Amino acid sequence: MSDFQWRFIDFALQYDVLRFGNFRTKAGRPSPYFFNAGLFNDGFALKQLGQFYAQAILASGIRFDALFGPAYKGIPLVSTIAIALAEAGHNHPFSFNRKEIKDHGEGGDIVGAPLAGRILIVDDVVSAGLSVGESITLIHAAGATPCGIMVALDRMEKGKSECSTLQEIKNKYDIPVISLITLDDIIAYLHTRQDLVHHIPAIETYRTFYGAKVPDTVNHTGRSTSV
């Protein structure tokens, strides 16, 4: 695990984005932990979040021309990532979609730069792949090419098959998926925290029931991959 991944977990705990206890996922599964990126909800948090994503994107080595954030959570996310990348010397155009198509003014369903070239989709946590499919459809319709997906957390849970949800997306659309951190990273972090280590058995039990059974080839930042 890279230093910035370690710091990101610290950061997520500080803002209660990552919590441990008894929760239920969107899929209806009881879960011993919860990750809600919507709680990065002040100026400092949003700036830091963009910097973490930018570091992860650059560390992955993925080649892209522009960024795209699916509405609604992807709108502030893609904006802060674009700023962080520019501050690091990598200036890229960005855009996002409207949920409701505008029929006046500039019109259309895309706000920001025109979709062109290789487009990197950025999101928080992909649970069902719905926003990903919609984003890919929009990108193709504009004549651009989706070249990858960047998310904050890979829960490493099986989706509709024995593969993880992110692996299913990778297989379906034949594009790389990058995660800032994984459940493995969270567990490794917990092993270093005496005040939190007691949560590990519940997480391991959860993985026994819901963890992906097929080896994952998703690009977890800091690990080598071909993109």
UniProtKB/Swiss-Prot annotation:
Keywords recorded for this protein, A-Z: Glycosyltransferase, Magnesium, Pyrimidine biosynthesis, Transferase
GO MF assignments: magnesium ion binding; orotate phosphoribosyltransferase activity
Pfam families: Pribosyltran
Pathway: Pyrimidine metabolism; UMP biosynthesis via de novo pathway; UMP from orotate: step 1/2
Cellular component GO terms, alphabetical: cytoplasm
Binding site for orotate: 34-35, 127, 155
Recorded superkingdom: Bacteria
Quaternary context: Homodimer.
Protein name as annotated: Orotate phosphoribosyltransferase
Organism: Nitrosomonas europaea (strain ATCC 19718 / CIP 103999 / KCTC 2705 / NBRC 14298)
Gene behind this protein: pyrE
